[in-house]
């Protein structure tokens, strides 16, 4: 979304005539697009776009209000450059999950324990440090989002993050080699590595999901007649939903690396488990470098974060009266923004309020990479590494994301709109069901011999098969489809154009708060308290979901109104990078209700 200033008729007329500075490159006319809060330095830089009309615009037919309510909504097409960005995400998540999957064993156990480890921090210490790593990885996106939106831009921030990431993985790999050092050096290397990886993750995570969504022009809904003769509405909001489903699908393809790294940990050692992600991460580096000219890189805001905080301060002093911050209402104040910016801040604040209950959701989600692994170590593994079963969450997502996107969501949309608030509520409920299953399973573990309530104090497990954990992972995957994917979509779609990375980082910050709650709960991650841990999380997630629905269901009624703000400027332009020919755009399906094409998805 590119916002144009409403600063009088003269300026508006200039914009209509296309009075922009022209840049020659490869015999293609390009222009620099500026909004009311983009600096001149940035606007005259390399942010160039092809403003040739889109082929679809020539036959544009807008729907009536009745058609908006009655016709089926479908998505548009996804450009090839989105696939390149998705490959970067896949590579980064391959490395992240491949590294973090063995962390619990690496921290909790010693070299002579079963399962083997390195740092000997016991269950409480390992769980606490695991939650710290999650906390750190989701605090740093605030820094990454601020830097990207204010100084460097998304692409440059991502590139800087990849360099730091490589350094962190290399330190972890070197210090995990048994012949290189002892336990003390391993602890030092581990701490240094997770700090660097956390910083890098923040710089990448706050911007990559925004960058992939930036590749989609925001267009008004239009009528399309399918080959079957059915009239449907091509809705860019559905396209955005499809992109984030696809993006999350690629995350989980990458997360399957834990299947390889846990096996390497079990059979070769931790050094081998960390070498694989180090090597694989270079795919992200290569894709970023060679795909640079393909990406749309939007202008960097001119101190837009600082201006947004000034608006919020004015709102606080005036009891959140948004008119108090509008230049049209108070021209004597000479505010360095326009009314449109204030309206976008209002929408962004509404989105941030929706995120208030997410820390509880992320707390239950975090048990999957900490307490679930410890629970598995109490059970009969039958040759399976205790940290291997995390893969079933990713496998379930890879299976069910296309099913939801191709069948479930289109089926529901035939009869009623499925709005974001409703989907997030369902996500909380499935999270509660997952913790309920884990609590019941834990009670059976404690009732089984030979060790009953104290299986962690022995090297042999209780007689319960570890595969009983799989339903909990599947339920968590359902909760992610509804709550996590929709949260990403909501954070992007409700953020002002030049604050999208920062608002996305606020959403990711809720994960950090969830990890902080998990750290506070680490003292109860001991025998025989795990049953109460899972029960408490189930109740908390259920209550939070109900409160979420009661507080925010009204936003479902204003969803279309909030989304309409995005159409006001971008519908005039086709935002394709100069170097990306139209032939690179691929039609996934007609209608685009599935993201699967020539690849697995």
UniProtKB/Swiss-Prot annotation:
The keyword Cell membrane does not apply. Residues 14-28 have a biased composition (Basic and acidic residues). Residues 173-182, 230-267, 317-378, 430-448, 514-526, 578-601 are cytoplasmic. GO terms for biological process: dipeptide import across plasma membrane; dipeptide transport; peptide transport; protein transport; tripeptide transport. It holds the Pfam family PTR2. GO terms for cellular component: cell periphery; fungal-type vacuole; plasma membrane. The chain crosses the membrane at residues 151-172, 183-202, 211-229, 268-287, 295-316, 379-399, 413-429, 449-466, 495-513, 527-547, 555-577. Coiled coil: none annotated. Residues 1-150, 203-210, 288-294, 400-412, 467-494, 548-554 are extracellular. Residues 1-10, 42-53 have a biased composition (Polar residues). SUPFAM superfamilies: MFS general substrate transporter. The modification Phosphotyrosine is found at residue 37. Residues 55-66 have a biased composition (Acidic residues). Residues 1-66 are annotated as: Disordered. The modification Phosphoserine is found at residues 39, 45, 594. Keywords: Membrane, Peptide transport, Phosphoprotein, Protein transport, Transmembrane, Transmembrane helix, Transport. It is found in: Membrane. GO terms for molecular function: dipeptide transmembrane transporter activity; peptide transmembrane transporter activity; tripeptide transmembrane transporter activity. InterPro entries: MFS_trans_sf (IPR036259), POT_fam (IPR000109), PTR2_symporter_CS (IPR018456). Uptake of small peptides. Belongs to the major facilitator superfamily. Proton-dependent oligopeptide transporter (POT/PTR) (TC 2.A.17) family. PANTHER family: OLIGOPEPTIDE TRANSPORTER-RELATED. This is Peptide transporter PTR2. It comes from Saccharomyces cerevisiae (strain ATCC 204508 / S288c) (Baker's yeast). The lineage of its organism: Eukaryota, Fungi, Dikarya, Ascomycota, Saccharomycotina. The gene is PTR2.
């Amino acid at each position: 979304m590119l916002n144009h200033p409403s600063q009088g008729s003269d300026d508006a007329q200039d914009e209509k005539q296309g009075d922009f500075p022209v840049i020659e490159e490869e015999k293609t006319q390009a222009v620099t697009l500026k909004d009311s809060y983009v600096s001149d330095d940035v606007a005259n830089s390399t942010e160039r776009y092809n403003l040739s009309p889109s082929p679809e615009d020539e036959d544009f037919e807008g729907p009536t209000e009745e058609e908006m309510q009655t016709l089926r909504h479908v998505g548009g097409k996804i450009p090839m450059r989105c696939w390149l960005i998705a490959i970067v995400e896949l590579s980064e998540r391959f490395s992240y999950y491949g590294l973090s999957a063995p962390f619990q064993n690496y921290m909790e156990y010693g070299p002579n324990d079963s399962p083997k480890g390195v740092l000997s921090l016991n269950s409480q210490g390992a769980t606490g440090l695991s939650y710290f790593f999650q906390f750190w990885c989701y605090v740093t996106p605030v820094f990454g989002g601020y830097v990207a939106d204010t100084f460097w831009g998304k692409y440059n921030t991502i590139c800087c993050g990849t360099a730091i990431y490589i350094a962190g993985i290399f330190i972890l790999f070197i210090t995990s080699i048994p012949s290189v050092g002892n336990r003390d050096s391993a602890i030092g290397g581990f701490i240094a590595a997770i700090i660097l990886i956390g910083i890098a993750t923040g710089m990448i995570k706050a911007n990559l999901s925004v960058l992939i969504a930036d590749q989609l022009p925001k267009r008004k809904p239009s009528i399309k007649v399918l080959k079957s003769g059915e009239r449907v509405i091509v809705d860019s909001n559905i396209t955005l939903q499809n992109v984030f489903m696809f993006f999350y699908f690629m995350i989980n393809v990458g997360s399957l690396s834990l299947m390889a790294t846990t096996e390497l940990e079990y059979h070769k050692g931790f050094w081998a488990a960390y070498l694989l992600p180090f090597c694989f991460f270079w795919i992200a580096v290569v894709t970023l470098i060679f795909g640079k000219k393909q990406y749309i890189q939007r202008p960097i805001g001119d101190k837009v974060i600082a201006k947004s905080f000034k608006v919020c301060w004015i709102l606080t002093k005036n009891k959140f009266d948004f008119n108090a911050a509008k230049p049209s209402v108070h021209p004597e104040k000479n505010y360095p923004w326009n009314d449109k910016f204030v309206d976008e801040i209002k929408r962004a604040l509404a989105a941030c309020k929706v995120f208030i209950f997410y820390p509880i959701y992320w707390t239950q989600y975090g048990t999957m990479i900490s307490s679930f692994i410890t629970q598995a170590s109490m059970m009969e593994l039958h040759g399976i590494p205790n940290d291997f079963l995390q893969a079933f969450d990713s496998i379930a997502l890879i299976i069910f994301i296309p099913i939801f996107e191709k069948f479930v969501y289109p089926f529901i949309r035939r009869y009623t709109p499925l709005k974001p608030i409703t989907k997030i509520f369902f996500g909380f409920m499935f999270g509660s069901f997952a913790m309920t299953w884990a609590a019941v399973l834990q009670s059976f573990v404690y009732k089984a011999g030979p060790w009953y309530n104290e299986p962690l104090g022995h090297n042999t497990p209780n007689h319960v098969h570890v595969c009983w954990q799989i339903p909990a992972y599947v339920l968590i995957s359902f909760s992610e489809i509804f709550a996590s994917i929709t949260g990403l979509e909501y954070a992007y779609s409700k953020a002002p154009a030049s604050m999208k990375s920062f608002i996305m980082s606020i959403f990711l910050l809720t994960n950090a708060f969830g990890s902080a709650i998990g750290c506070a709960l680490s003292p109860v991650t001991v025998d025989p308290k795990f049953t109460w841990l899972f029960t408490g999380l189930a109740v908390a997630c259920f209550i939070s979901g109900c409160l979420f629905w009661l507080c925010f269901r009204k936003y479902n009624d204003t969803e279309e109104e909030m989304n309409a703000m995005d159409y006001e400027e971008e519908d005039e332009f086709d935002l394709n990078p100069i170097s990306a020919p139209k032939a690179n755009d691929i039609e996934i399906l007609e209608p685009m209700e599935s993201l699967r094409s020539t690849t697995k998805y």
